[in-house]
């Protein structure tokens, strides 16, 4: 009925029909044909593989020839079988690619795969290969250079969020860098000298990022806020007390310091006075705890570096006698672990750091070595790398965020070679990568886990930041995309003003004044009138000595040395009272008035002649 209506409508409108009729397909027949073709091709593939195995067993030395002959035979057999099948059934679809026919030994069911298709198993294998290669995780494709100064950058610190970088050096300066606020000019937004003329040894942000620990060459560590303003300063101990446990603070130069990873108010410092002390930000008057490293003989040794474990339970210190000593944070008397011969005695161990896992300890020694230790088996090192020159007492080493790599820098003499940043595999301890940084020593290195960027401090005053645009986050990527701000040009005058020379004050001639007024003015001037200086009343001043007696001390000095000698005749002074004593006796005369009324005086005899029998040494010398 519908067909008749369509034909009548088409005839009325003047054309033969509304279009071609839709073709119909027999899906079952097509599926059966495809299945048959797939089975036949699978058989051909199996036959070709069996022939290849037979040929390879006969001639095992030649590996390339059987595969090519096998492919030729496969093609030939495929063409012959295809010619035989073409007489019976028609092949539907394109032939399978050679990689599919040669790789899959199972029965192929379904239509052929495209030539560029890769199985999911192959993709997983490639991903595993990429994961096994740690070199690809090193973010060093791009770099920026921050000019700190001209002297060694001896301290680096990056806050936990990665927004601000702080650098310190041998020039006593501490510079603050804000990645979000910097442009392509890469200028620091603040520079200061918190410890005056002392070299900066260490800088570190707290785990909250609100304060910075500054350790310099003096004996008092400082804590600054994010903008560089002082928060607290540790007290200095009494250097005349022998027992360092009884002093309230350090008495000698500091060597290092760091924050507690869990407690935001606690930090630690080590010093040349032979102690490691813990402090609380809220109490600057006295240290919180003290640890005293000892040598084999029980004598105090100097700790050159110190650090906390990742969980904050242990405190580790590298000492000048080559030992590494680890204490439990709650027990300061005896060490928990120690290794006496970790490094060469007499050298400064420049860095001690824990891995993110917490069981592996890495040490950078002054004996040009880098070692890793398992604190559970602390007698012998896990791995040792030697020949890494170290000229600085703060040369760093640090772990990558995934604990697969260990990085450190090398020192070079001026003008001889380039300083390098070396990457070691933690397991095999093979050097797998290196970066030539600059023509100076590499002192500090820092790999931030959130930014995935590497910061390096060098011996020529540079701080370099290495990053990868694809793998790194924020940090240096924020400032390199900003254009450098143009300097503001001085505003020019839109209209030129003509100024007469004599209108300016410097060209004006002074007006003539009367002589009388000038004389009166000179008379009031004590210098021009030669006025004599008035006498000084009271104590002296201005280099002039005051009058005597102005003060109590001067009055005493004036009167204490007076000449009090009596020039009067003593005999006349006594005889003045003779008449009164004779008429009114009071002391001696009444006692002798009855027994001896008349006074009897001693008779004056002439000098007796000296006997001649006396020895010469007894005779009086006249």
Curated annotation (Swiss-Prot):
Compositional bias of kind Low complexity: 67-84
Pfam families linked: WD40 (PF00400)
GO cellular component: nucleus; site of double-strand break
Superkingdom of the organism of origin: Eukaryota
SUPFAM superfamilies (alphabetical): WD40 repeat-like
Stretches with biased composition (Acidic residues): 120-132, 604-614
Keywords on record: Repeat, WD repeat
Family under the similarity heading: Belongs to the WD repeat GAD-1 family.
Identification of the protein by name: WD repeat-containing protein 70
